[in-house]
Structure formats: C-alpha cells, structure tokens
Amino acid sequence: MKILRKNHPLLKIVNHSFIDLPTPSNISSWWNFGSLLGVCLMIQILTGLFLAMHYTSDTTTAFSSVAHICRDVNYGWLIRYLHANGASMFFICLFIHVGRGIYYGSYVLSETWNIGIILFLTTMATAFVGYVLPWGQMSFWGATVITNLLSAIPYIGSTLVEWIWGGFSVDKATLTRFFAFHFILPFIITAFALVHLLFLHETGSNNPSGLNSDSDKIPFHPYYTIKDLLGIFLLLLALMILALFFPDVLGDPDNFTPANPLNTPAHIKPEWYFLFAYAILRSIPNKLGGVLALILSILILAIFPLLNVSKQHGLIFRPITQTIYWTFIANLLVLTWIGGQPVEYPFTTIGQIASITYFTXIIILMPVSNTIXNNIIKL
C-alpha cells in the first residue's frame, strides 16, 4: 500500500498533499480552519444538490417549492436547515481563517493569499445569489437593493443593472439566472480551492512563531489528520445544534413572507455575514462612494503584502500591532451590529466612525506600528 500511494499517478498527488506533506510541528488549532472550510464546502454542495432536485426557479412556485421541501420531502427540513446554517458556519470559518492569516503574517505567501481573496469574493457572490432563491420578502428586496448599486457606475450603470436583471425589475429571469449561478459557483470555488492548496504546498505552511521551520517538520498524517478530525467533529456538532435547535436564529423573519414587489420591508438588510460591508456602504452618503467603499472593504486585503514593512513575521512578538489588530476585530463586530440597525441617529454616526476606523487601522495604524517596532528592535 505504501509503495502504491508513492508511485500511483493519482495517489501520489494525494500522498504529497495529505499524507507525507512536511508540516511545521508547532502549528496550532488556528490552522484547522482550512480543512473545516473544505468540509463546509462539501456539506454545502451535497445538501445543495438534494435541494436543487426539488426546487423550482420560477417566481410563482419558488417560495412554495421551499415550503414543499420542508413539509413533504423526507428529511427535507433537515437538508434545508443544514444548507442555510452551513453557509453561516462556512463564513465563520472563513472569517477566522482570514483573521489567522493577518495575525500570523500568512499574506507574505502572496500567490496563496491572492487566490484566497478570489475565493472569498466568489463565496460572497455564491451566498448572495443563494439568499435570493427562497423568494421571500428579504430575498427579493435584498436582490433589488444590492444589484441596483451597480447603477452607480457612470455611463453603463443602468444598462448593466437591466442586463443582470434580464428585464426592468427583479423577476423570473433574475431568479432563473441566480439559480444557475448558485449551482455552478461552488464548483468554481472547489477549483480555486485546489489552486489555493497547490500554491500553499509550493512554499509550505506558515507557523505561529513566524520563523523558518524547514529544520522541524513532521508528516501531515497521522498527526494533523487526527487534529483535523477533532475540528471537523466540533464543527459538525455546532452545525447540528444550530440546525436542530435554533434553525431560524440567523435568518430574517421577513423571509417567511412571499416576495411582494408592492410592499417594501421597513428595514432591508442582507445575511449577518455581509453586515460589516453593508454598514460601510451605508455610512457614505454618496451612492458611488458607498459602492467603492464596499468593494474596497474586501479588496483592501490584497494590499497587506504591500504594507508589510515589519522585520518580524506575524504579530506574535509585536504587542503594539497586536493591540491595533484586536481593535480592528472589535471594530468589525461593531460594523456587523450597525449593519443590522435602522438608518437613524446614533447608528449612522457610529457606522461612520467604525468605517473610518476599519480603513485607518489597516492603511495607517498597522504599517506605522510595524515601523515603530522595527526601530525599537534596532535600539
């Protein structure tokens, strides 16, 4: 068996990626989230496939087909709630994975980091089009508001929005194409994830100390496969608790009402994992400015390798930058809270302050603190 896995053309790839892969001996549980994201992706594809067998992408029957899945399909309610809450677990793992990358300086592996940003954007696009499919009130109005933001693009904006809608409003054509996108994008994510792994295994993984670990590597199997299995068990436990005991806690009550173009909900908001970006969008009074800030709130991750002026790898030995990092995380939680609040005082003011802090922490405070740390080391 050992000779087969080392010599067989297909098994050799698996062997080099998951069995004999040289891995730093000191990587912590924060490194588990990559494998957890892979598990989340598989859960989403499998549950999504079974949902797609019963779902109809037609404005007159979409809402009823989701109700039919929950009421009449064997374990349809479980599949639907695993899929809906699986998306939340996916984004929790994704945010922690990115946060760990920033904290431990994984952005120096620029190819892996940039593919990761593409993965992040593709996952957000998949989640957005998926949220429209149940065709509830918040699905419809969320799709209308977010796609309408493209009209802020000069000259071609209005044409672009109508092209995406497939008409003059969000309707049957929009729902059909969003279903097509939602079906194909997870497979594109899978392809990008393999490229992400390919680039990672070219350079080797980072480690908590930020030091070169070439002299201290151990095989991935059995040490980290066991560690990953524990993480997967805890993830599945959390997902099952969420899906079985609190299935609707992260959803919106308005989505239990069928979509009605004549009745606007009092407060339109996306799913919780988009609220931080939505808060940044709303904090700028100008439409185009808001859209640009929304895009930059994600794309700003791409400038981390460029802003890396520190002589040390990661934040483990940099207490000043650590303070700024945790301020940034707290600020992100504030933005998430503000995104779910109505557009009125004091929420608008808090949102504007938090949005400024979000960009200031990354563009100014982190590089400045790194420069100070470099000068302290020289003393």
From Swiss-Prot:
Keyword match Transmembrane helix: yes
Cofactor-binding details, from the entry: Binds 2 heme b groups non-covalently.
Highest taxon listed in the record's lineage: Eukaryota
Known cofactor(s): heme b
Residues given in the record as heme b b566 binding sites: 97, 196
Listed Pfam families: Cytochrom_B_C (PF00032), Cytochrome_B (PF00033)
Membrane-topology annotation of the record: Multi-pass membrane protein
Assigned GO CC terms: mitochondrial inner membrane; respiratory chain complex III
Keyword annotations of the record: Electron transport, Heme, Iron, Membrane, Metal-binding, Mitochondrion, Mitochondrion inner membrane, Respiratory chain, Transmembrane, Transmembrane helix, Transport, Ubiquinone
Residues binding a ubiquinone, per UniProt: 201
PROSITE patterns reported for this sequence: CYTB_CTER (PS51003), CYTB_NTER (PS51002)
Membrane-crossing residue ranges in chain numbering: 33-53, 77-98, 113-133, 178-198, 226-246, 288-308, 320-340, 347-367
Chain sites annotated for binding heme b b562: 83, 182
GO biological process, one term: mitochondrial electron transport, ubiquinol to cytochrome c
Job of this protein: Component of the ubiquinol-cytochrome c reductase complex (complex III or cytochrome b-c1 complex) that is part of the mitochondrial respiratory chain. The b-c1 complex mediates electron transfer from ubiquinol to cytochrome c. Contributes to the generation of a proton gradient across the mitochondrial membrane that is then used for ATP synthesis.
Similarity comment text for this entry: Belongs to the cytochrome b family.
Subunit structure as annotated in this protein's UniProt entry: The cytochrome bc1 complex contains 11 subunits: 3 respiratory subunits (MT-CYB, CYC1 and UQCRFS1), 2 core proteins (UQCRC1 and UQCRC2) and 6 low-molecular weight proteins (UQCRH/QCR6, UQCRB/QCR7, UQCRQ/QCR8, UQCR10/QCR9, UQCR11/QCR10 and a cleavage product of UQCRFS1). This cytochrome bc1 complex then forms a dimer.
Extra remark beyond the main annotation: Heme 1 (or BL or b562) is low-potential and absorbs at about 562 nm, and heme 2 (or BH or b566) is high-potential and absorbs at about 566 nm.
Annotated protein name in UniProt: Cytochrome b
Taxonomic source organism: Akodon affinis (Colombian grass mouse)
Lineage summary: Eukaryota, Metazoa, Chordata, Craniata, Vertebrata
GN (gene name): MT-CYB
